[in-house]
UniProtKB/Swiss-Prot annotation:
Positions bound to GTP: 37-44, 105-109, 159-162
HAMAP family documented for this protein: Rel_fac_3
NCBIfam families associated with the record: prfC (TIGR00503), PRK00741.1 (NF001964), small_GTP (TIGR00231)
Species of origin: Synechococcus sp. (strain ATCC 27144 / PCC 6301 / SAUG 1402/1)
Domain tr-type G: 28-297
Pfam families referenced in this protein's UniProt entry, alphabetically: EF-G_D2, GTP_EFTU, RF3_C
Keywords from the UniProt entry: Cytoplasm, GTP-binding, Nucleotide-binding, Protein biosynthesis
GO biological process, one term: regulation of translational termination
Gene Ontology, cellular component aspect: cytosol
Protein name, UniProt field: Peptide chain release factor 3
Task performed by this protein: Increases the formation of ribosomal termination complexes and stimulates activities of RF-1 and RF-2. It binds guanine nucleotides and has strong preference for UGA stop codons. It may interact directly with the ribosome. The stimulation of RF-1 and RF-2 is significantly reduced by GTP and GDP, but not by GMP.
Record's subcellular location: Cytoplasm
GO molecular function: GTP binding; GTPase activity; translation release factor activity, codon nonspecific; translation release factor activity, codon specific
Gene3D superfamilies: P-loop containing nucleotide triphosphate hydrolases, Peptide chain release factor 3, domain III, Translation factors
Amino acid sequence: MGVHSFLCSSPWFRMVTDLQKEIQEAVQQRRNFAIISHPDAGKTTLTEKLLLYGGAIQEAGAVKAKRSQRAATSDWMELEKQRGISITSTVLQFNYHDCTINLLDTPGHQDFSEDTYRTLAAADNAVMLEDAAKGLEPQTRKLFEVCRMRNIPIFTFFNKMDRPGREPLELLDEIEQELGLQTYAVNWPIGSGDRFRGVFDRRKQQVHLFERSVHGKRQAKDTTLEWGDPQLADLIEPDLLQQLQDELELLEGVGTEFDLEAIHAGQLTPVFWGSAMTNFGVELFLEAFLDYALKPGARRSSVGDMAPDYPEFSGFVFKLQANMDPRHRDRIAFVRVCTGKFEKDMTVQHARSGRTLRLSRPQKLFGQDREVLDDAYPGDMIGLNNPGMFAIGDTIYTGKRLEYDGIPCFSPEIFAYLRNPNPSKFKPFRKGVSELREEGAVQIMYSADSAKRDSILAAVGQLQLEVVQYRLENEYGVETLLEPLPFSVARWVEGGWDVLEKVGRLFNTTTVKDTWGRPVLLFKNEWNLRQIEADHPELQLRSVAPVAAGQKPIEV
């Protein structure tokens, strides 16, 4: 018997191939996506309606509902419920037809674009939600650029078609001209505002006429007719029917052709139209998404691209969250499964520290709700209790050592000293700042003078600072004071302290340390930055922090 025949007949080989088949079947059923949008475009509403159609919830709760009504499933933090906005990412898993869908709900505010980027690092697809009356808005543009950095497929859903809005052709042109992204309308709206009658499905050449459900709480009823059915003339006003026919001819004549490869490369966005509040077009979007979306694929690592059916388990931490359950003051690490099969009670290696961990209470995440998880496959997101071991970007694995590409920090634009005016609250203050730093709620920096111990909060936007203060008071019982600093630009120094010492004294900049003890130069404005770059061309300054590996952060 040859070596190949012997190996193929061995129990070990059969066990591995059986496991790989199991993983491959699970991957075929997995889809995941993150939703990005400008505030008030209806992101939380769309999220809830997708859960409604997936059977994960029985009744949708509006964010701005009265207190007697249900709160939104994806908005679990008290401040989110008060303000009606998402300020932290959430994972929601549900089943639809034969697929398991992992939905990552991202913050709806550009001040939290770094949290959005971390979430997109775990996502295989993105859904860009737009208000049909407004089109592209500033924060959508910024979040789109974050998507582009990840080179993932982007699906576009134009929402609020039941309200007066802009011309659909004009909205498509805006995406193509301003984002440099080609568009393909998968369905097309019939009317808008109070004359919105439904959509035409170009895939199946069918007209879907919708009836409103009561406040959009239940699944919408759907009358489906074939294109050319004589009944259409009785159900749709003549001018709307003629307009639909004219616009469809225009799309077929000069519109971009459907190209699945271009979609997967992030060069072509499939476009959908509907109204999440009244459930118009939501299920059509979901069904097309399952057909077009990227399934979990290979991930780049320190030992090469790792295919999802590699039999050893591996994954990376893309988010940390403290106090999801205020009763237990817990800390959860969100992990994206990349390869193999995850099983409860398995023992894994923690790449950054080299330590061995037993994962005894893994959790399936659904907003604030959790249940114990027995297994998970590539593309799934799992929750692990975090006793202070994990940092964002950490890799866990079994088998041979590997590390996935880390998740970088971006240049903050607002800086302030964080003061604790009450010495008796030092312990909860330190604990709160440390845990909020771990989860990436804000970046923490320190004076280069070791005698000064006050933390410097560094954020993309003002709302981040407000959230940190709110959470310190609400979750840790600590009132704090902010002392604004006059900086607006931060740059990391390539080569670290050694390079900085060789350069000597620098003017019009202040040197601080980041969480990992690396030098960061703070500038009052871009002009001061350009001046330093001109005076010291030997300095390599980076707007994105190098990824920390094998290091421990400075203690608060």
